[in-house]
Amino acid sequence: MILTGDYHTHTPYSHGKNTVAENTAKAKELGLKELGIADHGFSHVAFGLRRRKLDNYIADCRQAEKDYGVKVLVGVEANIQGVDGKAELTEKDYEKFDLYLCGKHVFIWYDTFADMIRYGGGNFFADKFHKASEKLIERNTKAYINAIKKNPLDSVTHLNYLCPANALEVAKCASDYGTYIELNAKKTHLTDEELTSIVDKTSARFIIGSDAHSADRVGDTKSVEEQLARIAFPLERIDNIDGRTPNFRFAEYKKHL
């Protein structure tokens, strides 16, 4: 299994250690054809991309592509801000980005006060006490599904990490809307049983993302490969390996704006 592109990497514009150029240099060294710079979205309180730095962010990505000959996608890992599925990018933002990832993160500005308490707080305490109520799982599932339906997301990142949901139902929706399920190499997020169920019961497609917060982890797929081997995963369902490149929903959506 050879990675074609790594679409989930971070830089100091959010929570990463190495620059866009350093990540791109590593991608070139590994022979990757494409690299996604997907820093945390604007609503992340501590480690989010800031609008005042967006022009510099874009310029760094374009320059790195010229310097290293690797296609660099200007991306964002947006935050699901509430059960209604708000994911912080507006259509005015779309022209500035090439890649639209989205996942659940903890320390963000939520859509409403109720979302902060029931969605944000509920998941925080569920993680601390290692127990999620059926109501919370239902709420999280609704948040993921609404985010997919209401936003042209390219992938859902680290599904179920710090946000336990019905992964099968989320994957069904992702399949219907052309959104990838990310297999995240940094975080343990789907059990073997959940992933097997998704493969067997849906037509969802997948991409592998390193979620690299440093250049030395760009292109890292080790933990994902170990899980795939355990469950005899059909590699033809992964669209960023062995020469394949994803057919991203966001790019298709923007053609019709």
What residue spans do the PLM features occupy?
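Short, conserved active-site loops that position catalytic residues or coordinate cofactors/metal ions
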Residues: 35-46
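Divalent metal-coordination and catalytic microenvironments
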Residues: 8, 27, 39, 72, ...
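Alpha-helical scaffold segments that flank or form the walls of functional sites
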Residues: 21-36, 59-69
